């Protein structure tokens, strides 16, 4: 499955079920509802291997979330809203990013 089609699937989940963040790695998908970077930080601390090469769809990506995605070595990111500093940081690290 291509990065675009996988991101499209989890983006649909993000909006359809009103999650704040959806992460997919292979066949496993985890969806979160807390605001801010709490869920992403917990995932990075508890299961960093899950973020490796994962796809992430997030409602709001700021610089902190962007840094966690870089550290986790995610493969692709969709952001409904992204800050300029976050986009600059992700671009600097050659991360694949789609946003509205």
Predicted regions and their residues:
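Conserved mixed alpha/beta catalytic, RNA-binding, or beta-rich assembly cores of soluble enzyme
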Residues: 2-80
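Short, polar loop motifs at secondary-structure junctions
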Residues: 81-86
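C-terminal binding/interaction regions
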Residues: 72-75, 87-100
């Amino acid at each position: 499955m291509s990065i675009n089609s996988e991101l499209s699937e989890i983006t649909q989940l993000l909006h359809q079920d009103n999650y704040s963040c959806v992460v997919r790695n292979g066949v496993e998908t985890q969806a979160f509802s807390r605001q801010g970077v709490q869920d992403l930080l917990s995932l990075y601390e508890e299961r960093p291997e899950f973020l490796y090469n994962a796809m992430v769809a997030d409602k709001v990506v700021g610089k902190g979330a962007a840094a966690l995605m870089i550290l986790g070595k995610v493969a692709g990111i969709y952001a409904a809203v992204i800050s300029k500093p976050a986009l600059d940081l992700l671009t600097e690290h050659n991360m694949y990013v789609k946003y509205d």
